[in-house]
UniProtKB/Swiss-Prot annotation:
Keyword list, A-Z: Chromosome, Developmental protein, Differentiation, DNA condensation, DNA-binding, Nucleosome core, Nucleus, Phosphoprotein, Spermatogenesis
Residues where Phosphoserine is found: 8, 10, 33
Entry comment on modification after translation: Proteolytic processing into mature chains is required for histone eviction during spermatogenesis. Transition proteins (TNP1 and TNP2) are required for processing.
SUBUNIT field: Interacts with TDRP.
Keyword Phosphoprotein part of the UniProt annotation: yes
Species, as recorded: Rattus fuscipes
Protein name: Protamine-2
Annotated tissue distribution: Testis.
Compositionally biased tracts (Basic and acidic residues): 33-42
GO molecular function: DNA binding
Highest taxon listed in the record's lineage: Eukaryota
Described function: Protamines substitute for histones in the chromatin of sperm during the haploid phase of spermatogenesis. They compact sperm DNA into a highly condensed, stable and inactive complex.
Ranges of Basic residues composition bias in the record: 43-74
Chain positions covered by the region annotation Disordered: 1-74
Length: 105
């Protein structure tokens, strides 16, 4: 039996290092101390600040099943001054990863 771990809240400061960690995990989801609230808010806001695409754009990308990186480019013929024809009319590639794109040309 492990009775020495069951202690009243008033005896909190006398806990050992093992029990301290357990109590932290349990209380993390329910309530946050002032320091943790600040950290939590900062990381949460930081996540949104560094979002690459707007929700509308992500929704469009998801509908058309395109990767975010490819969508950020302008049109397929926008920067090409010499006329090669439209690249979109070519056969679709199977995989969009860099390795496969390099070998599919």
């Amino acid at each position: 039996m492990v009775r020495y771990r069951m202690r009243s809240p008033s005896e909190g400061p006398h806990q050992g290092p093992g029990q301290d960690h357990e109590r932290e995990e349990q209380g993390q989801g329910q309530e946050l101390s002032p320091e943790r609230v600040e950290d939590y808010g900062r990381t949460h806001r930081g996540h949104h600040r560094h979002r690459r695409c707007s929700r509308k754009r992500l929704h469009r990308i998801h509908k058309r099943r395109r990767s975010c990186r490819r969508r950020r480019r302008h049109s397929c013929c926008h920067r090409r001054r010499h006329r090669r024809g439209c690249r979109r009319s070519r056969r679709r590639r199977r995989c969009k990863c860099r390795k496969c794109r390099r070998h599919c040309h």
